[in-house]
Amino acid sequence: MSENGETAAKRRPILVTMNSHQYYEALSARDRRFDGVFFVGVKTTKIYCRPICPSRRPHAHHCEFFRLAAAAEVAGYRPCLRCRPELAPGNAPIDSEQKVVGAALRYLDRMEEASQSIPELANTFRFSDRHFRRMLRKQLGVSPIQLMQTRRLLLAKQLLTDTKLTMNEIALASGFKSLRRFNSLFKERYRLSPTALRKDSGNGESGSECTFRLSYRPPFCWDSILRYFRRRFYRGAEFVNGTQYFRTVQIGRSRGWISVENDPENLALKVEVAPDLLAVLLPLIARLRRLFDLDASPDPITAALGSLALGNPGLRVPGAFDGFEVGMRAVLGQQISVAAATTIAGRVVERFGERIDSPFPELKSMVPTAAQIAAVPVAELRKVGLTEARAATLAGLARAVTEEKINFLNATSWEESVKQMTLVPGIGPWTAGYIAMRVLGWPDAFPHQDLGLQKALSVKKASDALALAEKWRPWRAYAAMQLWNSLEKQHELPNHLS
């Protein structure tokens, strides 16, 4: 099936522009819909808070409002010890300018992995260093360095409060090159030492256990996203046990395992991380937030989807821990059932994935990387149960990712990303659209060529599905998940989704 000439419609912003009065009204109501959307600095105390802070409400003329925690810190405010701004959820990019910045933020996460510089990051997007910094400051209100420093400090603050990691381990996990630099910047920015903060929190140092929380906005359909991953996991590298998700992880040279479970009382996911992954905790957290779509805002999504979302208002769009991992899984699932594709995916891990030790017998291998699959002859790939054409497609995708002909990190256009992927022989619009929807994390993505979506909408043409979905902008990806979910409830999923 060919493309249907989808045009890029103007995206609506994630929120209408708010003035100080509206910010203050949201603060007064402690409205959770705005948690992470803005922060309030209290001029009399020089402390900044989340809008849901349980502390006594400050007078309006004492308040200053910021879009980002980093902007509040640059203005001289330090984080509240009660509402803990480091636990606030983030926001998904919607409009075109935000998509460029969103891609840049994904690359900032990668910089933590690969030690890239800001000029190198700017060059990736074909911008001058000066223009790139100016664009980020315009959108975010802070420089890239200021943003990264705040992210590191807030993670350190969370680890000091919630874990029993040593100071050296916390400095490493937060992205600092030395304990001295960590102590110096923390004390400079927050006006107390890391040791003093830990003492005040009543959390002593004793061991390398690392368990922390990642917040979300309610409602959150944990059962739905867990069911989705349970049916599509890489056996040997992932598993779902009851209400928990487990997987092996490799980021750079760091390898280990994680477990994730829902903590509904705290509106967060509880994550346990192997000690060997502490050095890459910042990029790991970013990947987990994308994987579980933790930055979604259910209320505006539900309002836009109307009756479509009534039965499942907290449904999330499953993301990607790794772009190639999702791409490979999509290729393995072409023209066969989900169950059959899951069997083949397990064989791929068993045959080509590197072994790893873990405390869980179900976790014994890594999912192969693009470079590892690219090095495997097509004849070898066929031995896991692939046809020659499918094996060639998988090899072609692996080469394209390895050679950076397909780059999921700096993608700023849904249409361009789909076009790049369809240049690989064997990857058509449906496969490319599905990969882009999960990997790029764009709320308005809609793979209209999908037969399941067409069936749920009672149409026979992709163009008709696209036209009907127009009313759900800018949340069409969530509409797609709701439509697939409706078919699953009716036991009418097409073969490639069942």
Regions found by a protein language model. Give the residues of each.
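HhH-family (HhH-GPD) DNA N-glycosylase catalytic core used in base-excision repair
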Residues: 3, 7, 12-498
